[in-house]
From Swiss-Prot:
Disulfide cysteine pairs (residue numbers): none
Pfam family, one: YfbU
SUPFAM superfamilies in alphabetical order: YfbU-like
Family under the similarity heading: Belongs to the UPF0304 family.
Record organism: Pectobacterium carotovorum subsp. carotovorum (strain PC1)
This protein's name: UPF0304 protein PC1_2778
Superkingdom of the source species: Bacteria
InterPro entries: UPF0304_YfbU, YfbU_alpha-helical_sf, YfbU_helix-hairpin_sf
Length: 164
């Protein structure tokens, strides 16, 4: 992250104020203030993660993934013959915190701040799937979007989606 000295000074002052306003996280803000003031390039890359950006397309894809899981759960609930479908496989696990942190952050924002999908269970890991999920979800999404009745899926369609 490239910043002018003026930008670094402004951000440093912001962290100093946050130290006073949020004593519970004061140590974190002091650390960030030091990094900014001294211009530690390696550590300043952390700010790229904090101030990262998700494109509109990625946000819409994540919402579609969450909507697909909602449709899977609704469809499963409405099935009379659930065959050998395991309900746990329909659960939205989230994304990997280590490699997909921005996606995970958006999911948490959608659920906890925006109030969308309140029925999704965050589990003990707060939607941290602890394994990469982006590619799997996109394969599932392609199958789901090809289904003619996306909210009235048959057991076969559900199986095809979760096995994608």
């Amino acid at each position: 992250m490239e910043m002018t000295n003026a930008q670094r000074l402004i951000l440093s002052n912001q962290y100093k104020m946050m130290t006073m306003l949020d004593p519970d996280n004061a140590e974190r803000y002091r650390r960030l203030q030091t990094i900014i003031e001294r211009g530690y390039g390696l550590q300043m890359r952390e700010l790229d993660r904090e101030f990262g950006e998700l494109t509109e397309e990625v946000c819409r894809t994540i919402i579609n993934i969450m909507e697909m899981h909602h449709a899977l759960q609704v469809s499963w609930t409405n099935l009379k013959d659930k065959q050998d479908l395991d309900e746990r496989r329909l659960t939205f696990l989230g994304f990997d915190a280590a490699t997909e942190a921005r996606y995970l952050g958006f999911v948490r924002f959608m659920v906890h701040v925006e109030g969308r999908y309140p029925h999704f269970d965050a589990g003990t890991h707060g939607f941290n799937a602890q394994t990469k999920m982006w590619e799997k979800y996109n394969r599932m999404l392609a199958v789901w979007q090809s289904c003619p009745r996306q909210y009235h899926l048959s057991a076969v369609e559900i199986a095809q989606i979760i096995n994608a």
